[in-house]
Structures are given as structure tokens and as C-alpha cells.
């Protein structure tokens, strides 16, 4: 008989640890195990806010997109969870070849160490998008049915939309919204739904910073572009130092915008296995100093192992 997480000790127990170990070897869980795991995750995520408070020190990460081996590399460089406190800003699935293993591992870590990892929703944590960009097909291929896809996409509805590190770094997948000028407006949204095609929840997951001032029409067909004037006003009104977001490929792994009011963090190196970009993660320490750690794809055997650390003392 196949044992579930629950029958092997629950979220504190060895059963989950064994599953995490299995996932770290890129071996998927059974459908039954995924179902039990996601039921536990839902209970935890239901209690979290649309603006989930996070304490420093914390390591902030951008898109992963099913690049499982690069996620393992990220943990090697940034430190294991729970030794390191992590905040992931969405887009765990699609495009890469290991969306199933990637999202299952992150959800398992969330259930095992709920206070040490925060997982936000990205625009790809959606039923519609995953049917086009790979996660749906991957679930079908690996499990023989769409059940696991349905279990995960139902869970995605509960992922928090944003996080707030030490009341001064606002973290979210996409960007700002013309419908939202303060954090209480975010807190009051009903997030338990498929990502809408328009409106504030859509914007938070789809918008991008832009060189042009004001609000602009997004070339993505969802969300908006927003200028430095918008970022400055938003940060000022909400007593924020910084908006940290993901959602856009940046060649160095991170990119400042709007005179260091906004930073983009992208954590999938050599994106889609062909873009040649670096990835990065942002470490915020106890004193709220910021260090970007850049990394390259997980080394294949015989290749050099290179990491570049870039301290950043802008505060």
C-alpha cells in the first residue's frame, strides 16, 4: 500500500523528509503523495496574507521555470532550507523540463518549514497559462492524467500575491497597478481564484517597470508598464525602500530600475536552456544590507564551477 505524507509522520516527520530527499534527486512523488502534500500546503497557505510579512535575514529569488537542476544549484549557493530563509517570487512551472519536480519540492519545503520559506504566485501559476507553456503537458506525460496538474493549479489559488520584508521591501512577481496605491488595497483583494485577465490582481502578476513615465499599455497583453514617477510615489506613500520583482529575463540575473527604487531578480540561468543569461538571488541580512549572488547553470560534469558575488551597499 502506498503511504501518504500523513501516515508517515505529517509535516514534522520523517515521511516528508524522505519525500524531500527523493525530490532533491529529481524523482517525482506519486499522485497520492502529491494530493496529500497539497492538502497540507493549502491549510498553511490559507492562513497567509495577500501581503505576507517576512523577517530578515532572507534570500529573495525570481523565476525558476521548471529548471530543477538550477534550483538545486540555487540552494547549494544560497544555503539549504531551513538554514536559509527563502522568499520565491513565482513562476515555478512552464518552459523548463522539470516543472513537476520543481514545484513539488518547493511546496514540500513549505509544508515542512512553513516559517522558513515563502512562495508567492507568479503569472504562470495559473490554469490557463500552464496549458499553453508546458506544465499541463508535463503532468500528462509523467502521471498519465491531468490529475496532478489540477491538484497543483487548485493550490496555486492560495499562494500569497506579495510579501513585505521588514516593512520596507515590497516583493511580488510582476509590478504595480493603477488600481492599487497602498498595501491595504492589496490586503483586501480576494486572491483565491484563477488569475483574472485584468484588474489589480492581474496587474500585480503581469506589470513591468518602464523607462517612460506614468502608466502604459503592456506589450504582454496583460498588466501595465509603470514609470519611475509611479514607483517613487508608491514607495513614498507606503514607506518602502524598494520594490523587488521578477517576471523579466535580465542578462546579469538582476537589474536596477527607477534609480534603485525597483529591482528585477531572475533566478533561471541560461533561461530555456539557450538564453545565455546569468541568474541571481538577493540576500538581505540582519542589518538589511543587500548582496546579489550571481550564478550560472548547474555545472555539467567536467565544467568549471563559477560564482560571482557582488556586494551592493545602496542602503
Swiss-Prot record:
Assigned keywords, A-Z: Cytoplasm, Hydrolase, Manganese, Metal-binding, Protein phosphatase
Enzyme class: hydrolase
InterPro entries: Calcineurin-like_PHP_ApaH, Metallo-depent_PP-like, PPA2-like, Ser/Thr-sp_prot-phosphatase
Gene3D superfamilies attached to this UniProt entry: 3.60.21.10
Cellular compartment(s): Cytoplasm
Active site per database record: 124 (proton donor)
One of the record's GO cellular component terms: cytoplasm
Gene Ontology molecular-function annotations: metal ion binding; protein serine/threonine phosphatase activity
Tagged with keyword Hydrolase: yes
Alphabetical list of CDD domains matching this protein: MPP_PP2A_PP4_PP6
Annotated residues for binding of Mn(2+) 2: 91, 123, 173, 247
Cofactor note: Binds 2 manganese ions per subunit.
Binding site for Mn(2+) 1: 63, 65, 91
The reaction(s) this protein catalyses: O-phospho-L-seryl-[protein] + H2O = L-seryl-[protein] + phosphate; O-phospho-L-threonyl-[protein] + H2O = L-threonyl-[protein] + phosphate
Main location: cytoplasm
Cofactor(s) needed by this chain: Mn(2+)
EC number: 3.1.3.16
Family indicated by similarity: Belongs to the PPP phosphatase family. PP-2A subfamily.
Protein name, entry field: Putative serine/threonine-protein phosphatase PP2A-4 catalytic subunit
Organism: Oryza sativa subsp. indica
Biological classification of the source: Eukaryota, Viridiplantae, Streptophyta, Embryophyta, Tracheophyta
